[in-house]
């Protein structure tokens, strides 16, 4: 079986809090988690966990977050074909009462076109 996923790479920061500060307030969250996100990225990692070596075309910046992502994709056996951007994309996720608010910081100014693949 072969699988190819195309999408946006996100570093997801999820935090649990009972209060969202405004203005000059500060507040300490109860818990947090950091993971890789984006629909295509999530699907590629799921396939890899199931023993299928997927191909993934997704954004990647040459910064520490992008290098961390590349390293983890390599560890999972994902054939990663990066679409270069200047900075990594982040999602800040705030779950509350079964719903979730999301703030995204995304660089979608691609430096290069889609890579040519021979798979």
Model-assigned labels for residue ranges:
Residues 26-27, 34, 49-119:
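Conserved N-terminal subdomain of the carbohydrate kinase-like
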């Amino acid at each position: 079986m072969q699988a190819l996923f195309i999408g946006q790479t996100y570093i997801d920061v999820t935090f649990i809090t009972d209060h969202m500060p405004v203005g000059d307030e500060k507040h300490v969250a109860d818990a947090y988690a950091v993971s890789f996100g984006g629909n295509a990225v999530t699907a590629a990692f799921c396939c890899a966990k199931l023993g299928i070596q997927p191909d993934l075309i997704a954004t990647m910046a040459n910064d520490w977050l992008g290098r961390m992502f590349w390293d983890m994709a390599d560890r999972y056996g994902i054939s990663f074909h990066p679409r270069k951007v200047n900075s990594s994309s982040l999602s800040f996720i705030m779950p509350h009462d079964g719903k979730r608010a999301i703030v995204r910081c995304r660089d979608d100014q691609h430096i290069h076109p889609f890579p040519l693949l021979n798979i």
